[in-house]
UniProtKB/Swiss-Prot annotation:
GO molecular function annotations of the record: carboxyl- or carbamoyltransferase activity; S-adenosyl-L-methionine binding
Keyword terms: S-adenosyl-L-methionine, Transferase
Pfam families assigned to the protein according to its UniProt record, in alphabetical order: Methyltransf_25
Species in which this protein is naturally found: Vibrio campbellii (strain ATCC BAA-1116)
Binding site for S-adenosyl-L-methionine: Y42, G67, C68, S69, D92, N93, D120, I121, N135, R202
GO biological process terms on file: tRNA wobble uridine modification
Catalytic activity: prephenate + S-adenosyl-L-methionine = carboxy-S-adenosyl-L-methionine + 3-phenylpyruvate + H2O
EC number(s) per entry: 2.1.3.-
HAMAP family linked to this entry: Cx_SAM_synthase (MF_01589)
Similarity field: Belongs to the class I-like SAM-binding methyltransferase superfamily. Cx-SAM synthase family.
Enzyme superclass (EC): transferase
Subunit and interaction comment: Homodimer.
NCBIfam families, per the entry: carboxy-S-adenosyl-L-methionine synthase CmoA (TIGR00740), PRK15451.1 (NF011995)
Name of the protein this chain belongs to: Carboxy-S-adenosyl-L-methionine synthase
Length: 245
């Protein structure tokens, strides 16, 4: 159950000077439409995050949604949480996203409280966590900040706790990488995006989103100390991984 939005037409007209992509008011207004039409398997990932939370949430623990945007993962988890004494902490640094996220969260009644926080996820304390979600968020951090954040998450997770990490992937084999990029662009065309929109969005986002390979992610998980980790979902060059402490 994702929030409805206006259609995404941000890149539909020619832009003389394309700036870096930001999660501003314009993007927040069209975000549900944008992400459904841009990220293959997004609805499946959101649904399954709720299922994973149901398995891993412990009573009297914290659940973190870091880079929560409009709260789709938060709402999915909240629908599945039956344990007592739990709290979801949903964090985003975009004021426009946080404002709308609060509206979406408050539209549904639940026994599990949600604290929507406007903050930089790098500055958030992680403690007593049974579930932490980074849903297409880590890729927007500078590479040097990623390891530090994952270390902090690991330290704040309870034993047996889970990190759910959804990302766009790059592939070491050039032929495979290009094929999956092409298939992703086919997916966007099939969802009504024009060549101009695809090209301009790519130009806007390439400097702010720097994806890693699955190997990079697994090596980091191993170095930090996670006991089990793997890919649980992939569609083209997008997917989601779990890492268990």
């Amino acid at each position: 159950m994702n929030p409805k939005s206006n259609p995404d037409t941000i890149f539909s007209a020619p832009i003389d000077k394309i700036g870096d992509f930001t999660f501003d008011e314009r993007v927040a207004e069209v975000f549900p439409d944008m992400i459904q039409r841009s990220v293959p398997g997004y609805s499946n990932i959101i649904s399954a995050i709720g299922m994973l939370a149901e398995r891993f949430v412990k009573p009297h623990s914290n659940i973190y949604d870091l880079g929560c945007s409009l709260g789709a993962a938060t709402l999915s988890m909240r629908r599945h949480i039956k344990q007592e004494g739990c709290q979801i902490i949903a964090v985003d640094n975009s004021p426009a996203m946080v404002e709308r996220c609060k509206l979406h969260v408050n539209a549904y009644r639940s026994d599990t409280p949600v604290d929507v926080v406007e903050a930089d996820i790098r500055n958030i304390e992680i403690e007593n966590a049974s579930v932490v979600v980074l849903n297409f968020t880590l890729q927007f951090l500078s590479p040097e900040d990623r390891y530090a954040l994952l270390e902090k998450i690991y330290a704040g997770l309870r034993p047996g706790g889970i990190l759910i990490l959804s990302e766009k992937f790059v592939f070491e084999d050039e032929v495979s990488n290009e094929l999956l990029i092409d298939l992703h662009h086919d997916f966007k065309r099939a969802n009504g995006y024009s060549e101009l929109e695809i090209s301009q969005k790519r130009s806007a986002i390439e400097n702010v989103m720097r994806p890693d390979s699955k190997k990079d992610h697994k090596e980091r998980f191993a170095e930090i100390g996670f006991s089990s980790y793997d890919v649980w979902f992939q569609c083209f060059n997008f997917g989601s991984m779990f890492a268990i402490k």
